[in-house]
Regions:
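Short acidic-hydrophobic, aromatic-tinged amphipathic segments that line or gate anion-handling sites
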Residues: 31-38, 141-147
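N-terminal Rossmann-like NAD(P) cofactor-binding module of classical short-chain dehydrogenase/reductase
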Residues: 53-56, 78
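Glycine-rich phosphate-binding loop and adjacent beta-alpha segment
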Residues: 24, 62-133, 167-171
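Short conserved AdoMet
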Residues: 48, 71-72, 157-158
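Local beta-strand N-terminus motif with an aromatic residue
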Residues: 29, 51-52, 136, 149
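Short amphipathic alpha-helix with an adjacent loop that forms part of the alpha/beta core around
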Residues: 38-50
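C-terminal capping/lid region of NAD(P)-dependent oxidoreductase domains
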Residues: 128, 134-142, 150-171
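Mid-domain Rossmann-like dinucleotide-binding core that forms the NAD(H)/NADP(H) cofactor-binding site
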Residues: 1-36
């Protein structure tokens, strides 16, 4: 959100709870949708209005299958995470054909920016100017041990708080 705002790029953010939506809106984020009943109709209208054609998906699972029919023509989905756990991504083949969708894996470690020292330096300088943005602060909610990763992944906390994994203390 911080990067999109700093570059004046239209962006739509999907969240799981109304509390998370309120937290983002209070931070100045304009287009935030809760992934509840009927959100795909609003997503379709808003994505067409804003001409958004890139999806950065850190969740995977069934959410991607829900939003795919609402995406504009020629959209590209960049998958970079798996907060949806082991739930498979299911998108009907006909959607790829009808909407000319593309799905790609995204990794910061393999991007053109990271492989080019000048681009990397410029990107880091940009991020440096945003690092103190409150939107980038992790609001720590419940703590889990490493062996509780499945519970942490399934944990939904209010107000945008996050489940975090903590290393065992070696006292």
């Amino acid at each position: 959100a911080s990067l999109a705002r700093s570059r004046k790029l239209p962006a739509i953010f999907l969240v799981r709870t109304e509390a998370a939506r309120r937290a983002l809106v209070q931070s100045g984020v304009e287009h935030v949708l809760v992934t509840g009943e009927g959100f795909t109709d609003r997503l379709r209208a808003l994505s067409n209005e804003l001409a958004t054609t890139a999806v950065f998906d850190g969740v995977g699972g069934d959410l991607l299958g829900k939003i795919a029919p609402s995406l504009p023509m020629n959209s590209t989905i960049y998958a970079y995470g798996f907060l949806g756990g082991a739930v498979p991504v299911a998108i009907p083949s006909v959607l790829f054909m009808m909407k000319n969708l593309t799905m790609r894996r995204f990794s910061n470690f393999e991007s053109r920016t990271v492989k080019d020292q000048e681009r990397l330096a410029a990107a880091l300088k940009t991020l440096e100017s945003l690092i103190d943005d409150p939107l980038l602060a992790t609001r720590i909610g419940e703590e889990f041990r490493f062996d509780q990763i499945e519970q942490a992944m399934a944990c939904v906390l209010p107000d945008g708080a996050r489940a975090v994994l903590v290393a065992p203390s070696h006292a």
